[in-house]
Amino acid sequence: PTDDYYTHVRLNGREYSKKAYGPVIVRPVDKKDNYVKRCVAIAGDTLLVHDGKVYVNGIAQENYPGIQNTYTVVTNGSPINSKVLDEMGINPQECWFDAALPGYRSIPMNEDDAKKVAQMGIVSEVRQNIDVYPPDYPDSPLMLFPFSENFKWTRDNYGPIYIPAKGESVDLTLENLPLYERIISNYEKNSLEV
């Protein structure tokens, strides 16, 4: 993005940026700003997402208030008024009406909004979408980390993946190599040959 830390430093100077924003404590190796919406696991943890539920070290995690999922909304054939969606904080441009359903295959919203939508007179059904393998789109494994066809993972059924802690060793195999090869070569700057 053009509005990142490095752009601010170039425009305002290092000293001003340091005073205005404080010192940089962590800087990504790739020097890109990263957006972390919610950190659910850290070094030393094993992360698993099963049917949309997050597990860390085998323990189910509480859903955060306001967490969004995607929902299928079946209507009587009429679309929901875009002003109504907008007033609920749902971006109408992210809601695709499908007359064949009839309704919407995917509306991103939280559970409270899903309950409100279910109460609308034109709505006959609201159900949370859970991605399972094989997903609707065949390239799914190539769109999610570790970007390998060997991992039949989706957004809602992901892992388990072990996140190594500092100083720990991981036994590498051809099966788990896609999980760790980028870390080893790009971030730890070690050569890796198979």
Task: State what each model feature region is.
Residues P1-V194:
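Soluble "head" domains of membrane/secretory-pathway proteins
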